[in-house]
Amino acid sequence: MKILDCAQIQNRDDLFRLFGECFPHYIGHNLDALHDQLTSLSSPTELTVQNWAAAEESLGRYANALKRMLNDAEAENPLLTIHYI
């Protein structure tokens, strides 16, 4: 299981750094690249997103775009499961 703790996010750079820690082969710094990474996962992967409210506070409207992208990636890749806690 991979854990993304949104309490550590103060800006977009933090967001993409944390995703890079969760997914070592991730090299992009935008939502399109992250979407490509998540939809190309070839083994079962669980991502737990903690403290989502902190992301909303730090990222503002960008957090909405992030959540839409995460939900889309989960719908497109049956091997990806995302939990928000």
Q: Regions from the language model: what does each represent?
A:
Residues 1-85:
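Positively charged, polar, low-complexity stretches
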